[in-house]
Every structure is written in structure tokens, then in C-alpha cells.
A protein has these predicted regions:
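Catalytic Tyr-X3-Lys loop
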Residues: 8, 24-43, 58, 62, ...
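Short C-terminal tail/terminal secondary-structure segment
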Residues: 17-20, 71, 148, 159-172
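Substrate-binding pocket helix/loop in short-chain dehydrogenase/reductase
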Residues: 21-23, 30-32, 117, 124-128
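Active-site loop-to-helix junction immediately N-terminal to the catalytic Tyr of the SDR YXXXK motif
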Residues: 26, 72-80, 92, 120
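Active-site helix of classical SDR
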Residues: 46, 82, 90
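Alpha-helical segment proximal to the catalytic Tyr-Lys
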Residues: 51, 95-99, 156
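Residue(s) in the substrate-gating loop at a strand-loop-helix junction
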Residues: 66
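C-terminal helical subdomain
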Residues: 106, 127-158, 165-167
Length: 172
């Protein structure tokens, strides 16, 4: 990006789950890959875009974390850890940019029927679904509605916040 680049909105949504296994069985290289994509990827995108937002005195950043980052999931320690890191990054960066008209928020969705489920065992997917009181997966339209509001001018106050969209799985 050059100095003339104007960026108003950044949505960080890349993510991988990795193996469905206990922490002590994780291959270190796979662990690093999950952290690199999910957490370091969010960091790198924010680091690249924030200076342009500061220059323009405006911006909206929405980080897609996960309910796993709040609650943790058995046999998903790397994914859960990476998304917990995204939540902490969101809170810190949101506070750093609060006086610059830049809102930084995260959403913590429960499972949705996307290709990420293909990375998980059927048993793990069923275990995830069993934790959701709504007894269904998140519809992508539900998530995009929340993300659109968070990235709009209508959201002029909320920053450094985490918005739950877990069908009742998380209560905080």
C-alpha cells in the first residue's frame, strides 16, 4: 500500500482449525501454522492498515474470533488459543485507537456451515452443536448482519468489545 491508500474497513476473517486432537499430541509445526494464520494474520493485517486509518481519522476493524476463544474446546487447543489471542488483540487495539475515531471489535460466532467444518471430525462437529442451546448452526446472514453494523458509521461508540453470536452457548 502506498501513502495515498484510503482504507475505511478491515474485516479479518481468515482461519483454520487444525487437527482435532489433544494438546500433547499436536505437532509443533501444525500448532505454529494455526497461530500464524489465525493470530499473526490478524496482527499483520491490522499493522498494515491502521496507519492509513489513523491518517484519515476514521476506520472500522472487525476481527472474526470464535466462541472457542472464550470457552475453549477440547481437542482444539491451538484453534481456541489463537482465537483467544484475537480477542485480546481486539481489546488492546480498540483501546489504543479509541480516541482516533477507529472502532475495533470482534465477533465470537459459534459454528456455521462453512468449509472450516470440513477440517473437523464429525464427532467434533456434533460435540460443538450439542453445546448450542438453539440446537442449530449459525446462519452466515446472521453473522454478516452483525459484521456490517460493526463496520458501519452507525457504530460510533462501541470499540474494544466482543460481540457474542453463539446461539446461547456463551453467557458472557
Amino acid at each position: 500500500m502506498d501513502a495515498k491508500t484510503k482504507i475505511d474497513i478491515l474485516i479479518n476473517s481468515a482461519g483454520i482449525t487444525g487437527s482435532t486432537t489433544e494438546l500433547w499430541n499436536y505437532d509443533y509445526e501444525e500448532w505454529k501454522k494455526i497461530i500464524d494464520i489465525n493470530l499473526h494474520g490478524t496482527f499483520n493485517c491490522c499493522k498494515s492498515v491502521v496507519p492509513h486509518m489513523i491518517k484519515n481519522n476514521y476506520g472500522r476493524i472487525v476481527n472474526i474470533a470464535s466462541v472457542s476463544g472464550k470457552d475453549g474446546n477440547a481437542k482444539a487447543s491451538a484453534y481456541s488459543s489463537s482465537k483467544a489471542g484475537v480477542i485480546a488483540l481486539t481489546k488492546s487495539l480498540g483501546k489504543e485507537l479509541a480516541d482516533k475515531n477507529i472502532a475495533v471489535n470482534a465477533v465470537t460466532p459459534a459454528g456455521a456451515k462453512t468449509r472450516i467444518l470440513d477440517q473437523m471430525s464429525k464427532e467434533h462437529v456434533q460435540r460443538m452443536l450439542s453445546k448450542v442451546p438453539r440446537a442449530r448452526f449459525l446462519e452466515l446472514e446472521e453473522l454478516t448482519s452483525m459484521v456490517c453494523w460493526l463496520s458501519s458509521t452507525e457504530n460510533s461508540f462501541s470499540t474494544a468489545a466482543v460481540f457474542d453470536i453463539s446461539g446461547g452457548r456463551s453467557t458472557y
